[in-house]
Amino acid sequence: MAGAGLIGIRRRIKSVTNIRKITKAMGLVSTAKLRKARVNLEINKKYYNEYKVILKDIINFIEDSNIYIDGNGSHKKLYVIFTSDSGLCGSFNINIINNVINEIKEDKENSLVIVIGQKGRMYLKKLGINTLAEYIEIPDVPTTKEARTIAKNIIKLYSSKEVGEVFLVYSEFYSPVKQQVLINKILPFTKENKSDNKYIEFNPPVTQFMDEILENYLKATILNCFSNSKASENGSRMTAMNGATDNANDLLDNLDLQFNRLRQSAITQEISEIVGGAEAQR
């Protein structure tokens, strides 16, 4: 009886040991990817913040009517959702999806969705939410190529009045254990009250290259979202895998203890049987 129990525990120890090898390896890979993602995030953040300052000045000094500032009259809202292609990253994806669901549940008819990432597509399909476009297999270090494709699609949808507002839903990275889901409105732009006496004159008129400015800004914004999303994903996966490895270690300690106790019990029982047999033969 004890022998069967020992075999079962030995199998569990082998199984948990194999799982621990996988989680430890994935944790190490995620750590390396996170390090690279954080470097990329810092570079993109500087460019994005500088471009935001420039765009703010441009918007505040445009006096002509412009659909990118005044709106296009459409009541449709577009949500561009940034999720991951791979799983095993804790609550990273589900937190984003839950925020989207809470945001659109009051006005489903006027809410449209573009999803980035296999996991987001899978969740939305299960929930019966249709998508306008899907982008998958985004590289670990996203480039302007991916950002440009999405930016052009957004501009097309907005300029054709298919959507009247555009929101980006992504996870802002703060640390490996802290990320926050943000829903940022990017179109139409919002003018701010001029609080200084700054005067800017554009030559040629800024309206002549507004489309180019818009596309470059959207590319910078989307790239910033990509960078935050990748860092958040790898931070979540690293934390999840390290936690899984720690749990596996705890489980192995308990299994080793059970194995040793059972083996000790079996040895004690065998000794008792031998002693009992010897006594019976006297």
Swiss-Prot record:
Main location: membrane
GO MF annotations, alphabetized: ATP binding; proton-transporting ATP synthase activity, rotational mechanism
Keyword list, A-Z: ATP synthesis, Cell membrane, CF(1), Hydrogen ion transport, Ion transport, Membrane, Transport
Membrane-protein topology: Peripheral membrane protein
Cellular component, GO, one term: plasma membrane
Gene Ontology biological process: proton motive force-driven plasma membrane ATP synthesis
Keyword Ion transport tagged: yes
Cellular compartments annotated: Cell membrane
PROSITE patterns: ATPASE_GAMMA
Pfam family, one: ATP-synt
Entry-linked HAMAP family: ATP_synth_gamma_bact
Function of the protein: Produces ATP from ADP in the presence of a proton gradient across the membrane. The gamma chain is believed to be important in regulating ATPase activity and the flow of protons through the CF(0) complex.
NCBIfam families, sorted: ATPsyn_F1gamma (TIGR01146)
Subunit structure: F-type ATPases have 2 components, CF(1) - the catalytic core - and CF(0) - the membrane proton channel. CF(1) has five subunits: alpha(3), beta(3), gamma(1), delta(1), epsilon(1). CF(0) has three main subunits: a, b and c.
Protein name (record): ATP synthase gamma chain
